[in-house]
Each structure stands twice: as structure tokens, then as C-alpha cells.
């Protein structure tokens, strides 16, 4: 699946229905462009601070859930710890794509598809992943507190991922 944004989704919907864009579609497209500077400002801060955000989120996660890094924990051993950091990077990177696109579909197709089953089969506690996503969300909000309405665009991808991971599980 290709990456999509709000505009592609709007146009695809109208194209599939064989309709011209109506005032609702035009309003939504205008909103996408009107909020672009905010969304791009957020992503610029994420990009500039990604290593620090990942480091802070992982430290806070392991502080809250020390069993993850103890023997037999899911992040115990260098290989598992590195895999955990890699996964944190994936969540952060794809959340930033979602923020720019103003669309969560990239999260379903690129991050969440099969991930829940993989984590369940490996015994990775989904509650820890949800905690991690909450930590990432709050760290980004803190770093973007000077951007008006940043929280609206930061909440959406992280809450979406948490919801999908929690469905019928945690």
C-alpha cells in the first residue's frame, strides 16, 4: 500500500463515487493546507530530536517496567534491547509520517498490520507497548509546546496505535 494523505483519501472517495468535489470536500482540503505549517513544525522538531526522544522514552519505559530488562524480560540481552529501540524508532518515524499526511492509514498498513500478532506470539506485553506510545506522545508534546494546537496532531497517531493494539487484548 502506498502512503496516502488526507487529500488523496478525499479525492479517491469522490472519484470512486463518480462525484465532483462538494463544499465539504473543499473545506477538508482547505483545512489540510491551513494546518500544514503546524504539522510540518511538529515533524521538524521530531526529526531534530528523534534520538533524544527514543532515548528518553526507552529510559522511562524501563524505569516503569524494569522486568523488561531483567533476565527473561523481553528487552533482556543486547539483541532484544536493540530490537526494542528499533521498534521505538519505527513507531516514532511512522507517527511523524502520519502527522504530515494528516492520515492514520500509514500506521495500519506499515506498522500495525501483523504487529499485534507478532508481539503476542513472542510474548511481548502489549501493555508495555501502549505505555511506550503514551511516553512518546507526551515527550513530543513537551518538545512542541510552543506550537499552537500541536497536541491535536500529536494525539491522533499515537491514540490510534494504542486503540488498535488494545482491541480485545490489554
From Swiss-Prot:
GO biological process terms, alphabetically, are: photosynthesis
Q: Which UniProt keywords apply?
A: Antenna complex, Bile pigment, Chloroplast, Chromophore, Electron transport, Membrane, Methylation, Photosynthesis, Phycobilisome, Plastid, Thylakoid, Transport
| Modifications after synthesis and translation | Contains one covalently linked bilin chromophore.
Instruction: List the subcellular locations.
Output: Plastid, Chloroplast thylakoid membrane
Quick one: where is this thing mainly located?
Answer: plastid
Please give an example of a GO cellular component term from this record.
chloroplast thylakoid membrane
Chain positions with N4-methylasparagine modification: 74
Output this protein's name: Allophycocyanin subunit beta-18
Amino acid at each position: 500500500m502506498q502512503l496516502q494523505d488526507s487529500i488523496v483519501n478525499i479525492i479517491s472517495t469522490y472519484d470512486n463515487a463518480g462525484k465532483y468535489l462538494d463544499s465539504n470536500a473543499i473545506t477538508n482540503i482547505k483545512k489540510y493546507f491551513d494546518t500544514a505549517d503546524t504539522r510540518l513544525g511538529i515533524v521538524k522538531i521530531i526529526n531534530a530530536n528523534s534520538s533524544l526522544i527514543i532515548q528518553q522514552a526507552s529510559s522511562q519505559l524501563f524505569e516503569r517496567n524494569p522486568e523488561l530488562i531483567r533476565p527473561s524480560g523481553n528487552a533482556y540481552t543486547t539483541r532484544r534491547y536493540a530490537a526494542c529501540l528499533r521498534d521505538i524508532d519505527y513507531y516514532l518515524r511512522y507517527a511523524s509520517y502520519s502527522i504530515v499526511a494528516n492520515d492514520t492509514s500509514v500506521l495500519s498498513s506499515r506498522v500495525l498490520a501483523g504487529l499485534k500478532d507478532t508481539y503476542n506470539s513472542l510474548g511481548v506485553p502489549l501493555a508495555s507497548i501502549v505505555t511506550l506510545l503514551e511516553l512518546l506522545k507526551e515527550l513530543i508534546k513537551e518538545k512542541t509546546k510552543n506550537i499552537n494546537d500541536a497536541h491535536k496532531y500529536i494525539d491522533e497517531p499515537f491514540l490510534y496505535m494504542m486503540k488498535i493494539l488494545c482491541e480485545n487484548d490489554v
